[in-house]
């Protein structure tokens, strides 16, 4: 049975909702097609941004545009292999359904609102790689903010 382990939004939830967050972990590194996507795009694990870099936005200032694009291509590859993207197009309903199924989020949950906002923010981007990285960064940043606000509460 095909699992949804590549679902990048679940990755964001696990990364930031977990009490033992590992901000040094590479985005997408725990998924089955990670090595395949790295190989397809000519990257090594050292080339991939960490969760901490992406959630804080440091990836935008610490890396060249070509590195940003290549990381985005790896994210797009993971999303596409899980059937959540085709080229530069999201399957928004499938993303929501998978996210809800995997996280147990309920209607009105701030995580779903964040996912929807991130998809809306990126929907008109045409480059599939850039679009994927911006989407992932948006979700990771939102998850970090939500995790911080719930820890403070």
UniProtKB/Swiss-Prot annotation:
Pfam families cross-referenced by the UniProt entry: PBP_GOBP
GO BP annotation list: response to pheromone; social behavior
Recorded GO MF terms: pheromone binding
Major location category of this protein: secreted
Transmembrane segments: none
Subcellular location: Secreted
Signal peptide region: 1-19
Record has Signal as a keyword: yes
Gene3D superfamilies assigned: Pheromone/general odorant binding protein domain
GO annotation, cellular component aspect: extracellular space
CDD domains (alphabetical): PBP_GOBP
InterPro entries tied to this protein: PBP/GOBP, PBP_GOBP_sf, Pheromone-bd_protein_Gp-9
Keywords recorded for this protein, A-Z: Behavior, Disulfide bond, Pheromone response, Pheromone-binding, Secreted, Signal, Transport
SS bonds (residue pairs): 37-77, 73-129, 118-138
Role of this protein: Colony queen number, a major feature of social organization, is associated with worker genotype for Gp-9. Colonies are headed by either a single reproductive queen (monogyne form) or multiple queens (polygyne form). Differences in worker Gp-9 genotypes between social forms may cause differences in workers' abilities to recognize queens and regulate their numbers.
Family listed: Belongs to the PBP/GOBP family.
Quaternary structure note: Homodimer.
Protein name: Pheromone-binding protein Gp-9
């Amino acid at each position: 049975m095909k699992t949804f382990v590549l679902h990048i939004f679940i990755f964001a939830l696990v990364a930031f909702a977990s009490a033992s967050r590992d901000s040094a972990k590479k985005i997408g590194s725990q998924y089955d097609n990670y090595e395949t996507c790295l190989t397809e795009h000519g990257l090594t694990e050292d080339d991939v941004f960490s969760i901490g870099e992406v959630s804080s936005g440091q990836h935008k200032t610490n890396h060249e545009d070509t590195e940003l694009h290549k990381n985005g291509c790896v994210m797009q590859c993971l999303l596409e292999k899980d059937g959540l993207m085709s080229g530069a197009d999201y399957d928004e309903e499938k993303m929501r359904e998978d996210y809800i199924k995997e996280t147990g989020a309920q209607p009105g949950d701030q995580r779903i609102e964040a996912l929807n906002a991130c998809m809306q923010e990126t929907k008109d981007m045409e480059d599939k790689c850039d679009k994927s990285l911006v989407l992932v960064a948006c979700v990771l940043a939102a998850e970090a903010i939500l995790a911080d606000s719930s820890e403070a509460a």
